[in-house]
Amino acid sequence: MSILIDEKTPILVQGITGDKGTFHAKEMIAYGSNVVGGVTPGKGGKTHCGVPVFNTVKEAVEATGATTSITFVAPPFAADAIMEAADAGLKLVCSITDGIPAQDMMRVKRYLRRYPKEKRTMVVGPNCAGIISPGKSMLGIMPGHIYLPGKVGVISRSGTLGYEAAAQMKELGIGISTSVGIGGDPINGSSFLDHLALFEQDPETEAVLMIGEIGGPQEAEASAWIKENFSKPVIGFVAGLTAPKGRRMGHAGAIISATGDSAAEKAEIMRSYGLTVAPDPGSFGSTVADVLARAA
């Protein structure tokens, strides 16, 4: 089983006719994702990457029954693309775009709260690698061949560390149910907590690897929630152990600005709530293997 997407999930690609949209739409289709259409204003009626193109998300949903989209839209227009998808009734939107202004994402968050919670669109990203349920569907930009189907969930703020974890686990014969890149921006569409709750409900996910980084309270909040609400083993990691205070390290949200933001502090918080913490990125696979062996 998996969370968020599977082989039947009907997917739209917003911005499909651009260079990035074209490349990754082809990659997703080749992987086996159920891409049913694309959206580019002014290019409706054409066929691209073997699927129909529509002018609006609403038109695309009405014609294809899509429930999910991935957006390859430039930063100045990315927030509007997310809100258009929400207005069309999509359940899930994955925003790959890096560089969306924080004020725009605040506007998106406010806009989505207009909808009742049960009808509210889940946004994954922005500035993320996307989602993959190995062997079923890929909604993102990750190299699909490094993922082995299995029973470990992965949630990561960093796309490339998520890749590293997948590659190490595959070498050890450990598979992944779903891997979610939530993105490295200060304001995310969804958090560790949102996806942990889904993994808790998935009977075929037996453990979760949670990869965080410096900056923000997400890791501490998730660790506290895990202690009280999560029944499966969780392996944690926090990138940025050597990062100096006040200096951004890669992602816009990766900056130590308050007590509890540093990697060492977050790792200690994880341990205090019962998580097993991987000591370094080279130990993802071995740490997951040790935890699974103890839980068997």
Swiss-Prot record:
Pathway: One-carbon metabolism; formaldehyde assimilation via serine pathway
Record's keyword terms, sorted: Ligase, Nucleotide-binding, Tricarboxylic acid cycle
Any one Gene Ontology molecular-function term assigned to this protein's record: malate-CoA ligase activity
GO annotation terms (biological process): tricarboxylic acid cycle
Catalytic residues as annotated in Swiss-Prot or TrEMBL: 251
EC id: 6.2.1.9
NCBIfam families named among the record's database cross-references: PRK05678.1, sucCoAalpha
Summary of subunit composition and partner proteins: Heterotetramer of two alpha and two beta subunits.
Similarity-based family: Belongs to the succinate/malate CoA ligase alpha subunit family.
Protein name as it appears in the record: Malate--CoA ligase subunit alpha
Source species of the chain: Methylorubrum extorquens (strain ATCC 14718 / DSM 1338 / JCM 2805 / NCIMB 9133 / AM1) (Methylobacterium extorquens)
